[in-house]
Design a protein with these regions (language model features):
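N-terminal "domain-start" segment that seeds a small globular fold
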Residues: 92, 115, 119-165, 193
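Thiol-/selenol-based redox modules, centered on thioredoxin-like
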Residues: 261, 265-307
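Short aromatic-glycine-enriched beta-strand elements
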Residues: 58-67
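Structural microenvironment flanking redox-active thiols in thiol-disulfide oxidoreductases
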Residues: 190-254
């Protein structure tokens, strides 16, 4: 994948700070160039549903018994290229929905893979509806200040399991927002590096009541499998580090309540960077805007909160 040049952007949120940050774009030379590339691409894409037969982690493939794809292919069992995270998440007999991609070289791949789980989907959907209502009721006061409680939500982690704040009750939580395709070294990549550094330093300092959460800014692309691949490629210890994704509406409401700006302008994702620390009672106790914060500073706050 080819990544982008930087474009400066002046952003002001409905929160008490003003920031200047670059935009992140998964493309090479602007909207016109990307549109032309898509027009010239010979890739074909189709929605797909089916049942996983088995995964091959070494070859990074899934064998799927898929349903008929109208106008393209009858129902059959086929092997598809996928991410290593998707293979790791795969369970034999699991129903999935995905996007089938016929690449220019003829290879067939699956992207945007989601498990079809009515129970989990209902749980996430219900929580997302409640979050939407809460954000709407709060109106102009939707932004949560330091001292307010963490909003309730439910999202999927990098393994596809449903995660809500209840899972972390009695623990401190450090939260930030990233997306896996972000090419700007001083933004998401630095934010992730700082989070993993904080995780390591917290462990060394004996802070054991801490969980780390990175919520995607790009839920359409960042499926559980993509997030798991992202974590694995960086050697991140996920025993207390969750990467979350879910409905776009829920992500937008969380961004609003946390005072984070993220908006696609064409293919460009313009966003700010913020990191928050939540105490064991669910209260926001610290916030750092931008990506130049110190892991040692957060660990110090954690140690103080633990005592």
């Amino acid at each position: 994948m080819v990544y982008s040049r930087l474009r400066p952007l002046l952003l002001m949120a409905s929160v008490p700070f003003l920031v200047v940050l670059p935009a992140c774009k998964p493309g090479s030379a602007g909207d016109k160039a990307e549109a032309a590339a898509k027009a010239d691409s010979k890739e074909k894409r189709y929605p797909l549903t089916g049942e996983i037969i088995k995964g091959d982690l070494e070859r990074s493939t899934l064998l799927v018994k898929h349903d008929e794809i109208p106008g393209y292919m009858m129902a059959m069992t086929m092997e598809f290229a996928v991410t290593v995270g998707d293979v790791a998440n795969a369970q034999s007999g699991q129903r999935i929905r995905a996007e089938l991609v016929e690449r220019e070289d003829g290879e067939l791949a699956l992207e945007k893979i989601w498990a079809i789980d009515t129970t989990a989907d209902a749980q996430v959907g219900s929580a997302s509806g409640a979050l939407r209502q809460d954000t709407s009721i709060r109106g102009r006061r939707a932004y949560r200040e330091v001292g307010e409680n963490l909003p309730d939500f439910a999202l999927y982690d990098q393994t596809g399991k449903v995660v809500s704040p209840a899972k972390f009750r009695g623990k401190q939580v450090m939260i930030n927002f990233i997306f896996t395709r972000c090419p700007v070294a001083t933004m998401c990549p630095l934010a992730t590096a700082n989070m993993t550094s904080t995780q390591r330093k917290a462990k060394e300092a004996g802070v054991n009541d801490i969980e780390f959460i990175s919520i995607t800014l790009d839920p359409e692309f960042d499926t559980p499998g993509v997030l798991r691949t992202y974590a694995q490629q960086r050697g991140i210890d996920t025993t207390n580090f969750s990467f979350l994704t879910g409905p776009e509406s829920a992500i937008k409401d969380l961004l609003t309540q946390f005072g984070v700006i993220a908006e696609f302008k064409g293919s460009i994702l313009q966003h700010t960077v913020s990191t928050l620390l939540i105490d064991t009672t669910g209260k926001i106790i610290w916030r750092a805007d931008g990506s130049q914060w110190s892991p040692d500073e957060f660990v110090g706050k954690m140690k103080k909160s633990s005592t």
